[in-house]
UniProtKB/Swiss-Prot annotation:
Annotated function: Catalyzes the NAD(P)(+)-dependent conversion of L-arabinose to L-arabino-gamma-lactone. Is involved in a degradation pathway of L-arabinose that allows A.brasilense to grow on L-arabinose as a sole carbon source. Prefers NADP(+) to NAD(+) as electron acceptor. Displays high catalytic efficiency for both L-arabinose and D-galactose in vitro. However, the enzyme appears to be involved in the metabolism of L-arabinose but not D-galactose in vivo.
Pfam families named in the record: GFO_IDH_MocA
Annotated NADP(+) binding sites: I15, S37, R38, D169
GO terms of molecular function: galactose 1-dehydrogenase (NADP+) activity; galactose 1-dehydrogenase activity; L-arabinose 1-dehydrogenase (NAD+) activity; L-arabinose 1-dehydrogenase (NADP+) activity; NAD+ binding; NADP+ binding; oxidoreductase activity, acting on the CH-OH group of donors, NAD or NADP as acceptor
Protein name: L-arabinose 1-dehydrogenase (NAD(P)(+))
Gene encoding the protein: araA
Induction of its expression: Induced by L-arabinose but not by D-galactose, D-xylose and D-glucose.
Family named by the database record: Belongs to the Gfo/Idh/MocA family.
GO biological process: L-arabinose catabolic process; L-arabinose catabolic process to 2-oxoglutarate
Length: 309
């Protein structure tokens, strides 16, 4: 394989067009060669109706980036790995933890890279927050991740089906940040899932966790919020409150704003994917998904009014 990695993208929907394709175009380590999607095409590359057709035709392809919904990701990722391709997974990495474990083992067996991405971990505030918190006495953590589902997921029925996560689809972004910036592991203690009567996944949720020192970590997720999104994490410490806002684009410490670099979540993901391939390594951290899975396993369910379509 040359230094430039030939790449295929599978699932040309909103996230692929808004984030993946521009990031690939800006990353010199990748050359977009082909795409697969049932209902869309990308100009300037070869297009196929599905991954099977792409893999059959593009024998020299080095890697694939999977952007389809999580319910189909396991079958796609397994097919790509068995075809000898490195694989990058949009979040969440799978519909179940078991799927991801099998994929990780398969990648290791085949000597291939598997990268389970968490784009919010690449937000500008995350690493400065992590470094500052590493030496602080943390007292409590409060997460508020709220938005309007009709604005951010219009017509996306898959989010309401089993494996679609519901409000945890954006909420897992917050959990990916929290599990990155906090110095100790989290354990779920209680959860409440608010589920509309006509769907399978929650429209709102509350999680109460604690780290291994007993520090409380509370998360509130709500898809009925608006018109202004609330994507915030507040960490109370002995040296003041560290506050992340705008989904990780802004940071303040003890009331003072911190100057951050430019936003480059998806470009950073592709740069990391290229580096992983070059080193022959994988990066699969399932802790955010495990917290969500624990909430579904352990949480109390409360039915609410039908969502409608």
């Amino acid at each position: 394989m040359s230094d430039q990695v030939s790449l295929g993208v599978v699932g040309i929907g909103k996230i692929a067009r808004d984030q993946h394709l521009p990031a690939i175009d800006a990353e010199p380590g990748f050359k977009l060669t082909a795409c697969a999607s049932r209902h869309a095409e990308v100009t300037g590359v070869r297009n196929y109706r599905d991954l099977r057709a792409l893999l059959a035709a593009e024998r020299e392809l080095d890697a694939v980036s999977l952007c389809a919904p999580p319910q189909v990701r396991y079958a796609q990722a397994r097919a790509a790995l068995e075809a000898g391709k490195h694989v990058m997974l949009e979040k969440p990495p799978g519909a179940t933890l078991g799927e991801v474990a099998v994929l990780e083992a398969l990648a290791r067996e085949r000597g291939l890279t598997l990268f389970a991405t968490w784009h919010s971990r690449c937000a500008s505030a995350v690493e400065p927050a992590r470094e500052w918190l590493a030496t602080r006495a943390i007292r409590a953590v409060q997460v508020r991740w709220k938005e309007d589902v009709r604005r951010w997921h219009p017509g996306q029925q898959w989010i309401w089906e089993p494996g679609g996560l519901g409000v945890f689809d954006p909420g897992i972004n917050a959990l990916s940040i929290v599990t990155r910036i906090l110095p100790r592991e989290l354990v779920l203690r209680e959860a409440t899932l608010i589920v509309p009567s006509d769907v399978q996944t929650p429209i709102a949720a509350e999680l109460d966790c604690a780290d291994t020192d007993g520090v409380p970590v509370r998360a509130e997720f709500d898809w009925r919020h608006g018109p202004v999104e609330q994507w915030e994490i507040a960490v109370d410490t002995a040296d003041g409150v560290l506050a992340i806002s705008r989904g990780g684009a802004q940071l303040s410490i003890a009331g003072e704003p911190v100057e951050l670099g430019p936003e480059r979540e998806y470009p950073a993901l592709y740069a990391h994917f290229h580096a992983l391939i070059a080193r022959g390594e994988s990066d699969v951290d399932v802790r955010p998904l495990r917290l969500v899975a624990d909430a579904f396993l352990f949480g109390r369910r409360v039915q609410t009014d039908a969502f409608g379509r």
